[in-house]
Amino acid sequence: MLSCNSANADYLFHKERASYDGSLDVGDKTLQCGRVIDIMKLWTYFKGNGWKQIAEQVENEHKLALYVKDYVIAHPDRYELVVPEVDTFNVCFWYKPVEMDRKNYKSEEEYLQLLSKVTVLAKKYMIDEGKLLVGYSSSKSPYYFWRTVTSNPYNTNEDMDFKMKLIGEYCEQAFKELMTK
């Protein structure tokens, strides 16, 4: 079943899972995750909603992604865009902990390696606490960053503010733990 349905989407279902129980990522083992079922989901959604409502929802999701991008830009001391242009529902960024000053690291590589560790550990805190679930990615680079996707038609700007604030809290907690090791 896994070999038939798996998309092997490393950007969604992280293979390393060093910091949390990988059995929670069951999506790659299900029929619903495969591309085969996507057209059926789209057709059913279209029949129930029509083009106008779908267009409004897509536009709203894109506006929310742009809102997150603007949030990151408005807080350059804490956030940094990885991909400056947002033309989808994905926003890729790093959270920079308060006490983590780029000038204190010998190289950019050392700095980004620590940001990656902070991201992965913060994801563990998210899963353990269960308040929020945001993915991270590496986009074929050795460094992990946050990859948030706006895909809930009921989300608001306030929900995005909450998400970004919580990401910051988890990252601050992760940084402190990493510095005490």
Predicted regions and their residues:
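Generic recognition of stable, solvent-exposed alpha-helical segments in well-folded globular domains
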Residues: I37, E56-K63, Y67, V86, ...
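Surface-exposed helix-capping loop/turn segments at secondary-structure junctions
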Residues: V72-V82, K176-K181
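Conserved PLP-binding catalytic core of the aspartate aminotransferase-like
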Residues: L81-M126
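PLP-dependent enzyme catalytic core of the Aspartate aminotransferase-like
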Residues: Y105-E108, S138-K181
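Short, hydrophobic beta-strand segments
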Residues: T44-Y45, C92-Y95, W146-S151
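Active-site C-terminal subdomain of aminotransferase-like
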Residues: M1-H75
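Short beta-strand
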Residues: E80-V86, V134-S139, K181
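A generic structural motif
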Residues: G48-K52, E99, N152-N157
